[in-house]
Amino acid sequence: MLKTINPTQTQAWNALTAHFESAQDMDLKDLFAQDAARFDKFSARFGSDILVDYSKNLINEETLKHLFALAKETELSAAIKAMFSGEAINQTEGRAVLHTALRNRSNQPVLVDGEDVMPAVNAVLEKMKSFTDRVIGGEWKGYTGKAITDIVNIGIGGSDLGPYMVTEALAPYKNHLNLHFVSNVDGTHIVETLKKVDPETTLFLIASKTFTTQETMTNAHTARDWFLATAGDQAHVAKHFAALSTNAPAVSEFGIDTDNMFEFWDWVGGRYSLWSAIGLSIALAVGYDNFIELLEGAHEMDNHFVSTELESNIPVILALIGIWYNNFHGAESEAILPYDQYMHRFAAYFQQGNMESNGKYVDRNGNPVTYQTGPIIWGEPGTNGQHAFYQLIHQGTKLIPCDFIAPAVSHNPAGDHHQKLMSNFFAQTEALAFGKNEETVKAELVKAGKNAEEVAAIAPFKVFEGNRPTNSILVKQITPRTLGNLIAMYEHKIFVQGVIWNIFSFDQWGVELGKQLANQILPELADGSEISSHDSSTNGLINAFKAFKA
């Protein structure tokens, strides 16, 4: 079990509070000027393909000393061991947390309730390999004897965000199959997708552990009805639908052959499920071997996380720096900014990963916390973001720590595109860190021919204060393996922060109330009768909706 230590009651927290009084005046220009080796001291390499530069943060050696002390005092190392050893650290649901077992390429035993889960994990992987080989190779035929050309993954949350993010990030490795993802219960999503595919050559993956998820099953039934409108015979469903689920009776009743049902386990959380059978769409998109490379990459980061001392542990360092901003500097959000168009859903994926994990106000003792927990996560690819929201990051009143991610080698080395992209990547972190003072601004204006009055009028608006913190994560190239490294790195960062904040990171009770109320409201929308059973606002909205529809 995880310890229940209030971080604010630790000696390290008190030391950080005292340290912050002087640290508020830290200036990155001074920190770099005072230490020519700062980059070397505050950067880390992961293997030969990833460099993490955290030198442009508002930290010094004393800051890190206290942060590592906080990690030790909250018994982080014991928590890491507890997770990897299969303890039921998801205590509110009584479950182990073992997405790491899904990518345990060492195949060393991982025990849950005394039973090694690896034989079951490997059996599902073998089943996925056989299935993907048949579909990709054209051996799997539709009801008219044609090979499959399109895959439609129907899921929501972790059953959609992860596979979609990865298949987009690994698009350069894509084979001939066309991938489509449907998640929203808004009928527009499924209807627009079905316009693009042919029932004779489309395979649907229904991703729902329970096979009862409202949004997923609504879309699944619509897809089946659309398919049968052409195929006619219910028996043909088995050739065009597969299930990522554990509910065999419901899968069979839907018309899916349970031989084409791919299982996963209750110790796999939805937002960590891309490593499981939920990743079948990934394997179909890029091939089984590349899917295994993705798992290998994540396993490499798992090994680093488990075996590396805290002071050199990349996910731990990133997590602690995040706590420094969240709990001491008062930062409310973090931006993830990948300078790679293929990674355009990476921030959205970790928006769920972080905010669903650590968006909690009750600690592991069951008491409301008296400190900040999970940050708001957001971001877009560069350079698009530069022309959208970087203005606020540079000159706004909010402190927004940013992670900049970029590959050194592009999959599309067209002309000088990548050099221009990377020049912006390097320039932005430099500009955020060091800014431009008023003296420099005025000198530039004078050089541009402005008179003294014009200089005085415009100069204040062109000043960049700098001192905006960033991490730079430079990757040799985005490959299945390095993408696996990156995803696991962020997963473990989230876990570390949850441990230190004394919250449960692997449940998500906050999604339940809205579902319950929606189920109560749904039958009230069936006719035109006036509703009065809710508060005046909800009643008014429902009745206005009915009036608009009438």
From Swiss-Prot:
Pfam families recorded: PGI
Alphabetized GO MF terms: carbohydrate derivative binding; glucose-6-phosphate isomerase activity; monosaccharide binding
Its EC number(s): 5.3.1.9
Active site: 356, 387, 515
UniProt-listed GO biological process terms: gluconeogenesis; glucose 6-phosphate metabolic process; glycolytic process
Catalytic activity reported: alpha-D-glucose 6-phosphate = beta-D-fructose 6-phosphate
Keywords assigned: Cytoplasm, Gluconeogenesis, Glycolysis, Isomerase
Main location: cytoplasm
GO cellular component terms attached to this protein's record: cytosol
Pathway stated in the Swiss-Prot or TrEMBL entry: Carbohydrate biosynthesis; gluconeogenesis; Carbohydrate degradation; glycolysis; D-glyceraldehyde 3-phosphate and glycerone phosphate from D-glucose: step 2/4
UniProt xrefs under InterPro entries: G6P_Isomerase (IPR001672), G6P_Isomerase_C (IPR023096), Phosphoglucose_isomerase_CS (IPR018189), SIS_dom_sf (IPR046348), SIS_PGI_1 (IPR035476), SIS_PGI_2 (IPR035482)
Family: Belongs to the GPI family.
Role: Catalyzes the reversible isomerization of glucose-6-phosphate to fructose-6-phosphate.
NCBIfam families named among the record's database cross-references: PRK00179.1
Name by which UniProt lists this protein: Glucose-6-phosphate isomerase
Organism: Vibrio vulnificus (strain CMCP6)
UniProt gene name: pgi
